[in-house]
Amino acid sequence: MVLDGFAAHFDAYLENIVREGKSEHTVAAYRRDLEELFALLAQMPSEDAGGVPQGLSQRDFTAALRRLSQRGLNARTLARKLSSWRQYCAWLVKRGLLHTDPTADIKPPKQPERVPKALPQEWLNRMLDLPVDGGDPLAVRDHALFELMYGSGLRVSEIHGLNADDVYLDEAWVHVTGKGRKQRQVPLTGKSVEALKNYLPLRQTASDGKALFTGRNGTRLSQRQIQKRLAQWAAQNGDGRHVSPHMMRHSYAGHLLQASRDIRAVQELLGHSSLSTTQIYTKLDFDHIARLYDEAHPRAKRQDE
């Protein structure tokens, strides 16, 4: 398949993943990654491109990855782009539009292990226990938002997608639609239930009235707005540290694992499809145990202390 033929089904592919229920953010990322790939393949000299006029090969995609690496992209970003390319190639093969998948045997760049940053439990408790101005609907909304974020460990995309009827306050749980449209039920803390009960009577609603967290005009808060409100809240009330929804989720996972030691339960609560994704939080747990050991064990103290 020549390059023109390879790219010819691009729009049909995007329409297909929209029908599958992929989010706008995911579809936009696939679009960017594939448009970038097409441009790279078109720019390659024939000796790099593996004979594009005759067809595309594994060497073409390896060369494209090498070009992106030379631009300074990190291993995580390269692995994500390769995943986007693979999804497209697999779709073409499945429909008989490509004989074999030239990306199938390409190994993604090895990524350095990254330990998530968790916020101190005491700091979070102090911040979330700050007085809330009950006369300010946005302050009441934000408090409910942040309690839910830390209390249930939801992704920012999951919070963005919540509807009011996803929350069951009497039973103290929330129905969450996660990655890949996977459904799960997550418990609510007592603090989250209380904060949501204070917020719901003040919620501004638009014409559809579905969104749980809305702005002044009643429309659903965007992911960017949620991130911005959290950062502003932390900057105004905290000690200057940067706080993101991802860090709140990491904190939830790390603190829960410290208390429960049940990694399978934490996996279910986080909505991870693979246990290996959850296992990174065991490093946070080990750090906590190591600090306790250093503080408590009589043989852990250095001689000069």
Curated annotation (Swiss-Prot):
Q: Which residues form the active site?
A: 155, 179, 246, 249, 272, 281 (o-(3'-phospho-dna)-tyrosine intermediate)
Residue span(s) of domain Tyr recombinase: 114-294
The record's annotation in CDD domains points to: INT_XerDC_C (cd00798)
Q: Which InterPro entries match?
A: CB (IPR044068), DNA_brk_join_enz (IPR011010), Integrase-like_cat_sf (IPR013762), Integrase_catalytic (IPR002104), Integrase_recombinase_N (IPR010998), Integrase_SAM-like_N (IPR004107), Recomb_XerC (IPR011931), Tyrosine_recombinase_XerC/XerD (IPR023009)
Give its localization: Cytoplasm
Domain (Core-binding (CB)): give its ranges: 1-93
State a GO cellular component annotated for this protein: cytoplasm
Which processes are annotated in GO (biological process)?
cell division; chromosome segregation; DNA transposition
Cite a single GO MF annotation: tyrosine-based site-specific recombinase activity
Listed transmembrane segments: none
For this UniProt record, the keywords arranged alphabetically read as follows: Cell cycle, Cell division, Chromosome partition, Cytoplasm, DNA integration, DNA recombination, DNA-binding
A UniProt-annotated Pfam family: Phage_int_SAM_1
Q: Which family does it belong to?
A: Belongs to the 'phage' integrase family. XerC subfamily.
The job of this chain, per UniProt, is described as: Site-specific tyrosine recombinase, which acts by catalyzing the cutting and rejoining of the recombining DNA molecules. The XerC-XerD complex is essential to convert dimers of the bacterial chromosome into monomers to permit their segregation at cell division. It also contributes to the segregational stability of plasmids.
Q: How does it assemble?
A: Forms a cyclic heterotetrameric complex composed of two molecules of XerC and two molecules of XerD.
Name under which the protein is recorded: Tyrosine recombinase XerC
This chain's source organism reads Neisseria meningitidis serogroup A / serotype 4A (strain DSM 15465 / Z2491)
